[in-house]
Amino acid sequence: MAIYKKKVAIISSYAYIRGHNNYGSIFQYYALQQYLKKFDVDSCWIRYMFPVWSMYKDLIKKTVNSLLYGFRLKNIWNHIKTQIAFRKFMYDKCNLSERKYDSIDKLKQNPPEADVYITGSDQVWGGWLEANYLTFVPNGKKKIAYAASFGKRQLTEEHLFHVQAWVQGFDAVSVREMSGVDICHSMGVKAQCLLDPTLLIDEVDYLPVGVERLEKGRYVFCYFINERNFDNFRLEDIIAYSKRQNAILKITGIEGPEMIIPLRYLYQYSPEAWLNHYKYAECIFTNTFHGIVFSIIFQKQFCVLLQKGVAAKQNERIYSILKLFELEDRILDSNKSIENIIAKPINWDNIKKIKEKWRLKTDAFFHEYLNI
């Protein structure tokens, strides 16, 4: 049995994942857990969730939308099966807190025991959910933000009003985007930009060497989020491209795309199967931060489609990760063809150097603030 140097409690997106099949959200916690384990740090994921009724809100919304956008019982059933697979992954692969909490008051009354408390990563600071700012942590215990994301370039005055004092109470703050550093500075808080946890571990830490591929034929894989406008996907172009490549098209979509994508292309996977499809895809199309991250992890050729309309604020995360790895030319716009982007080689040696440099910054951060 391992002897751990430190006990860390992490609050992240547990409540969100209970209602949404979001691959990036679940893997960012898993990756941070695996990373900390390498330093003999025992971590637990605080099971903080909203009241029970809200757990079913997403399913109700999907059911109503399915009726509005076309009768899609198959899609609803697939969502339920995938949600079951997500929960199995959480219970089998993630260290969870012994207790569940459904209010900040209960967290304050009886928080999980730990030497250090961490919030992050993902968009834990996209709003002012009090628990994500670690206000429940007992006096004298260290509070750290790791790669926390605001999910936007600037905050409203209302947002600042709610969170400024909470952020100022942290012992150490790191954020995921450079815009987050500026936001923290505007609150009088010193912050540094660090890697998303998913980039702290390697491909082999997600999938064992030699794992058998699930799809035997050639396929193009897409991961989309937040869009409900068919035209924003350039889906006809992607379909045509996959046909030219003699590859089938597989699309995973959440938060909207699953309601408009033709069912013959739409798939929902367990977390493990989703990774497998990333690993063996011919190429990737995505409009998400973690869609880009896993293209990098599995060294896949990829195209990025920017989000539009209300969801366009999410592009801040996309610009940030592409700039970090010098991959801004992967954005598919009206002036570029899919073939031109996919044919353009990616310098994976340079990607590896950038990743290693930024991993050292994370190592230094935790060595300083976890004393490991």
Language model features with spans:
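Active-site anion-handling motifs in enzyme catalytic cores
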Residues: 1-372
